[in-house]
Amino acid sequence: MLTLTRLDSAQPDFQARLARLLQFDDATDASIEEAVATILHAVKTRGDAAVLEYTERFDRLPAPSAASLELGAAELAAALAGLPEDTRAALEAAADRVRRYHEKQLQGSWTYTEDDGTVLGQKVTPLDRVGLYVPGGKAAYPSSVLMNAIPAKVAGVAELVMVVPTPGGERNALVLAAAAIAGVDRVFTIGGAQAVAALAYGTETVPQVDKIVGPGNAYVAAAKRRVFGTVGIDMIAGPSEILVIADGSTPAEWVAMDLFSQAEHDELAQSILLSPDPDYLDAVAAAIDQLIVEMPRAEVIRTSLTNRGALIRTHDLHDAAAIANAIAPEHLELAVSDPEALLPKLRHAGAIFMGKNTCEALGDYCAGPNHVLPTSRTARFSSPLGVYDFQKRTSLIHVSEAGAQTLGRIAATLAYGEGLQAHARSAEYRLTHK
């Protein structure tokens, strides 16, 4: 029998116990930081030569030149053509849904004109070039390609450069096919911190990008953190999370499997169930014990649920919503009979899955919204990856002669108050009646 943490929001020490449950040490190992710093410096100063050395060392992939590590469009097309018909259809259907959803996020430029003829506005511009990191080797994450690449393309990014490690030369056809479907422009078979460095600084062969997105291991995360400022990054993601609020109307087996869906990612993933019904919590616990023996990743799930999972009894659904807001989970499932009634109470979550038919796994692959979501309580101030992450906004100011008279006097007064005489004089030069 799996031992799960059981909490009750009525307990005097509930908040302290919940805080301990949510604690996660995201400090990067000093040896990783040191190794990443060395790799970044080498690639920054030595370019292609360093990339080739690290690719041979870490991926066991010797290459005569950095150019030979680039895959041509024909290879991506061949990977797509070689897929089983049902797999290709599923990828294309998912891509279409992701594309249609993200097209709703497009923002355009705008202006307005004041009474004196002054025009103010905002110019929205896509980024020029974006780098996409995709885990490679035996791990197949075609969904990650779609979720990162499609919003960039919808935003109008001119060039999307994907890096994907191929340990021992092992290429993943699903990943390459997804790149073809998503419209990735260039693909390099490099990975790790050296790939992040190549994208951030540019080499003789790999072009420098403006922003790097996509998941990776601890070395990739450390590298992204270090190059931020030279380039933009999407986020530094923590372990996967799911929080389920249930009223007992959803079969216990369904909710148990939903908890598994995040727990199977890794031992640090967090799966929590909130319910005011203690009998239902018992039923889910029993379902967990019954179903876990069927799972290929049972040991990972068991470790995750034992160390970081919890079944929490709440006073009512409103109490559950308040706890959910404090946790600010990556994925929030509302396994309740009336999710619309509960929705106004919820403020902080990466994505909200409403109703018993809406399992989190659908959002991971094909519902349409992005599966790149804030973790580790950052949903309190962060949003899912979207088209807006690949656009930037520039303020527009076109002051008329009449406007310069009013604004010039205001600006000069404030500038003199701050002791910035050149600012003040610059505004005063535009005054026709001084």
Swiss-Prot record:
Record pathway: Amino-acid biosynthesis; L-histidine biosynthesis; L-histidine from 5-phospho-alpha-D-ribose 1-diphosphate: step 9/9
UniProt binding sites for Zn(2+): 262, 265, 364, 423
Cofactor binding description: Binds 1 zinc ion per subunit.
Domain of life: Bacteria
UniProt keyword terms in alphabetical order: Amino-acid biosynthesis, Histidine biosynthesis, Metal-binding, NAD, Oxidoreductase, Zinc
GO molecular function: histidinol dehydrogenase activity; NAD binding; zinc ion binding
Cofactor: Zn(2+)
UniProt-annotated binding residues for NAD(+): 133, 194, 217
BP-aspect Gene Ontology terms: L-histidine biosynthetic process
HAMAP family per UniProt: HisD
Task of the protein: Catalyzes the sequential NAD-dependent oxidations of L-histidinol to L-histidinaldehyde and then to L-histidine.
Entry's family note: Belongs to the histidinol dehydrogenase family.
Protein name (record): Histidinol dehydrogenase
Organism lineage: Bacteria, Pseudomonadati, Pseudomonadota, Betaproteobacteria, Nitrosomonadales
